A protein has these predicted regions:
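Bacterial N-terminal signal peptides that target proteins for export
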Residues: 1-8
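Long, low-hydrophobicity, acidic/polar, solvent-exposed interaction domains
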Residues: 20-143
Length: 143
């Protein structure tokens, strides 16, 4: 015979186990998303001399981070170097007509020697991140 106390315990346990959530699948990491973009096709961009015609992501390495220039919106998005790959991974496939390649340049304006050091440090970090994600970089001379 089931006692009322045991009955309540069984009801509580069945309600508790029925309310447990299933684990949420992890979203793919930025590198995985970026690998879905075809490799860079230099035949599509090697003839470009005026960078205003560049249609892939364009980066400007600054002392305080990296600017991701969104040509579709004419917007500049400042990100930390370590947040660059997630920001690139959020861009739609239509932003990558040349394949997995970005144009990048150093900010030509330096207020101090520390700015130059910070820009060189950020350039190294960005270069390493992009190389690790198999994204080609077309370095453009600073204006």
């Amino acid at each position: 015979m089931i006692t009322p106390r045991l009955l309540w315990l069984l009801i509580f346990l069945s309600a508790f186990t029925g309310c447990t959530t299933q684990p949420v699948p992890q979203a793919p990491d930025p590198e995985t998303i970026l690998q879905a973009i075809p490799p860079a096709d230099s035949a599509k961009y090697q003839h470009i001399r005026d960078m205003k015609k560049w249609r892939n992501p364009y980066l400007i390495v600054r002392a305080d981070g990296v600017v991701l220039f969104d040509s579709a919106d004419s917007a500049e998005i400042l990100v930390k170097p370590e947040d660059l790959l997630p920001a690139l991974a959020k861009m739609p496939a239509s932003y990558w007509p040349y394949g997995r390649v970005v144009a990048a340049q150093e900010n030509g304006v330096r207020g101090s020697e520390q700015d130059g050091v910070a820009i060189r440090r950020n350039k190294g970090i960005v270069g390493g991140l992009l190389q690790g994600a198999h994204i080609a970089v077309e370095w453009v001379p600073a204006a």
